[in-house]
Amino acid sequence: MRLSIAARRAAEGTREGDSVSVNGVCLTVGERDGQILTFYAMPETLRRTALGGLVEGGAVNLERAMAAGSRFGGHIVQGHVDGVGVVLGMRPEGEAEIWEFGAPEAVLRYAVEKGSVCVDGISLTLVSVTRGSFTVSVLPQTRTNTNLGELGEGDRVNLEADVIGKYVERLLAPRIERFATTERSVEDAV
């Protein structure tokens, strides 16, 4: 699939071969013509993300890769989508809105209240996590300056869990398995 995007700010300083997040999906710039960036999404990318549902003229979230030494805001986002979620609803809360997203277990297993999640490339703080869904608080600034203003119930979004949780799980898995084996051995001996 070929995606050509009028990028304006994201095009500044961007060259062919650079990585750019498109709705939270890390893609490589295949061509650049002024402010138009063209990307090619592989079949595997389309199977694992919501990019196939993009419509011509629709808004997307774009972000260039962070340069080493740059100001760090939000959380570590790689553009490696862990699953596709769906907008379940939104409701006002003061000046903000609470948005609820249905999410697969591949994302929810790393979700903790007050932790971080990436929704369509937007770093957001989790308000609550339940079986099958999570909520985030969306400020007016975020809604206005991202594609959230164009989303509604039932729309699909790309989700990326906080990578720190994935690394912690990977590092601890052998120890947890050894502990479980030891615990079973003790129970069998008793």
Question: Where are the predicted features?
Answer:
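Conserved loop->alpha-helix
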Residues: 1-190
